[in-house]
């Protein structure tokens, strides 16, 4: 009697255990469901070869293709089988997917990790990250180039309308025989010659536009700086090592280039900004006051800033600007006052 009761209980326990093992080993919604993808394609995991994989897939795809079945119910079964075969092939032909699947087979207990890897790979875009990076750099570089071109055109249009630059261009054009004056002192309108375009081209050739409105160049784009980045790093390391060797170890005295570097560093400007902003007289003053020493440079900079503030405060234009800003206005780049 006791054995008759124990047998059904044992059967239920074993059945429950088998179901639990199945649920831990394979998840219906992952990969090939409750089947092993290797078994689906009839390939040996230990002797895996992509050429054999492709061959096995083509053979099974032909055998189980839904178009070969006419019966409606059998066609549905064939479609389901064909889907499993295709899923198995897509899983094993991709290196990353195969690695994740092998881990899934070897570590069935790590359910959450296996789910994450499966859906992460499915959700990830099938695009080479290198292509995305290169494409992004090129788009940014194109935008930089076109923006610089537009700003340079704005600067030239502005300069063309300024009397001083226009008169200088007209004089230069007359000297070169590109423009002619009539008896009344006005420019002749020769056939086939656009005087305004000639003047504009002369201004472009002779005007030195710097800063944010300088002429566009590929050498100012992100793409170019990315290309020369290794060389830039090498030069920086070489320069730093040489500086340390000369002035920290050898205790050499600073030459003029080293002094100028320290001055720019303490003022807080780049070499291009320094060349644009400071005259030869300013540089002589900086050297005379030994501004390569940090404390001297700080004193000089404070005096310079105070003098500029006072000069601006006394300027009628600056006062108009302050009143304008007080009234919540904005100021444009071009101001001909």
Swiss-Prot record:
CDD domains: DnaJ (cd06257)
Intracellular or extracellular location(s): Membrane
Main location (coarse class): membrane
Residue intervals passing through the bilayer: 4-24, 127-147, 222-242
Coiled-coil residue spans: 293-323
Pfam families: DnaJ (PF00226)
Record key words, sorted: Chaperone, Coiled coil, Membrane, Transmembrane, Transmembrane helix
Gene Ontology CC annotations of this record: endoplasmic reticulum membrane
GO biological process, one term: protein folding
Membrane topology: Multi-pass membrane protein
PROSITE patterns membership: DNAJ_1 (PS00636), DNAJ_2 (PS50076)
Residue span(s) of domain J: 36-105
Family the UniProt entry places it in: Belongs to the DNAJC25 family.
Protein name (record): DnaJ homolog dnj-2
Organism phylogeny: Eukaryota, Metazoa, Ecdysozoa, Nematoda, Chromadorea
């Amino acid at each position: 009697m006791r054995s008759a009761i124990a047998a059904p209980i044992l059967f239920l326990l074993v059945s429950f255990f088998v179901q639990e093992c199945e649920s831990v080993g394979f998840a219906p919604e992952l990969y090939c469901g409750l089947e092993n993808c290797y078994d689906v394609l009839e390939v040996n995991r230990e002797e895996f070869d992509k050429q054999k994989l492709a061959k096995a897939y083509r053979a099974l795809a032909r055998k189980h293709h839904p178009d070969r079945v006419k019966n409606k119910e059998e066609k549905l079964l064939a479609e389901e089988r064909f889907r499993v075969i295709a899923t198995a092939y897509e899983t094993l032909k991709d290196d990353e997917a195969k690695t994740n699947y092998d881990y899934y087979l070897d570590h069935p207990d790590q359910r959450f990790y296996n789910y994450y890897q499966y859906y992460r790979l499915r959700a990830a875009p099938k695009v080479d990250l290198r292509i995305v990076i290169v494409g992004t750099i090129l788009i940014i570089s194109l935008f930089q180039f076109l923006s610089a071109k537009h700003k340079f055109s704005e600067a030239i249009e502005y300069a063309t309308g300024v009397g001083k630059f226009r008169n200088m261009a007209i004089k230069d054009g007359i000297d070169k025989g590109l423009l002619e004056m009539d008896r009344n002192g006005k420019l002749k309108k020769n056939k086939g010659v656009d005087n305004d375009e000639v003047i504009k081209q002369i201004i472009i050739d002779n005007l030195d536009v710097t800063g944010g409105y300088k002429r566009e160049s590929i050498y100012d784009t992100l793409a170019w700086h990315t290309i020369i980045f290794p060389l830039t790093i090498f030069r920086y390391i070489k320069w730093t090592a040489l500086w340390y060797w000369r002035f920290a170890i050898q205790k050499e005295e600073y030459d003029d280039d080293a002094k100028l570097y320290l001055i720019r560093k303490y003022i807080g400007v780049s070499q291009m900004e320094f060349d644009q902003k400071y005259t030869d007289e300013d540089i002589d003053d900086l050297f005379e006051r030994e501004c390569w020493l940090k404390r001297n440079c700080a004193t000089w900079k404070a005096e310079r800033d105070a003098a500029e503030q006072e000069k601006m405060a006394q300027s009628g234009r600056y006062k108009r600007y302050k009143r304008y800003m007080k009234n919540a206005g904005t100021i444009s780049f071009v101001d001909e006052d």
